[in-house]
């Protein structure tokens, strides 16, 4: 109950969520590249879940309107409008589809290269990346919420470690392929469960009408 939020805060916080970064370098899009190399961070999601800190209290609105005042003692969600923003690199972090509003935005396959004005709802993690990848002429903070940060519950961390141990123990062993797949699916689902939106429109199928959508009301969402 201490973490329960109202529907307004829920909608606000959901807009801050975004998926992983997958994007082609615009200089090489459409070309066949040979003799390339790559690497992968093994079990990156579960590693971050046990090593980093997350919101452990309810997010609350605060009056801060200065980016320099967003200290790392808290988790932050920021509704911010940038003006005269531009990317420093060929690979661009900000996604146009996640912006709330924009004016004269130049994009590279959906990623923002520059814009006269663009508005987002971001986390403090996003802001750390954006500060490294972009420069801007000015900004206006429209709304800010903050929560105290801490490590995830010990029981959850222990479960993640248990699943990771099972995954690595069975990996590459032909006689334990099913056990490996089960452990891998389990550890992958931990993150997925944390970011699944449970408050959605209803979907109903009947033989007479086929598929229909039952829009979620604010009252039902709050319940």
Regions found by a protein language model. Give the residues of each.
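Conserved acidic
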Residues: 1-223
């Amino acid at each position: 109950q201490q973490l329960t939020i109202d529907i307004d805060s829920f909608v606000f916080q959901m807009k801050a969520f975004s998926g992983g970064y997958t994007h082609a370098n615009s200089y090489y899009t459409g070309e066949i590249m040979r003799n390339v190399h790559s690497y992968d961070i093994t079990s990156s999601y579960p590693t971050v879940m046990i090593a980093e800190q997350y919101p452990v209290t309810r997010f609350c609105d605060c009056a801060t309107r200065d980016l320099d005042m967003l200290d790392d003692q808290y988790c932050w969600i920021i509704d911010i409008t940038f003006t005269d923003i531009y990317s420093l690199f060929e690979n661009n972090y900000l996604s146009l589809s996640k912006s709330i509003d924009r004016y004269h935005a130049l994009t590279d396959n959906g990623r923002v290269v520059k814009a006269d004005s663009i508005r987002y709802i971001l986390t403090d993690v996003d802001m750390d990346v954006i500060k490294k990848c972009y420069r801007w002429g000015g900004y206006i903070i429209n709304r800010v919420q903050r929560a105290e940060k801490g490590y995830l519950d010990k029981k959850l961390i222990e479960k993640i470690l248990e699943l990771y141990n099972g995954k690595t123990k069975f990996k590459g062993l032909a006689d334990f392929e099913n056990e490996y797949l089960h452990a891998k699916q389990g550890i992958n689902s931990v993150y997925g469960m944390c970011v699944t939106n449970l408050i959605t429109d209803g979907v109903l199928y009947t033989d007479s009408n086929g598929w229909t959508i039952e829009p979620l009301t604010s009252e039902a969402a709050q319940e």
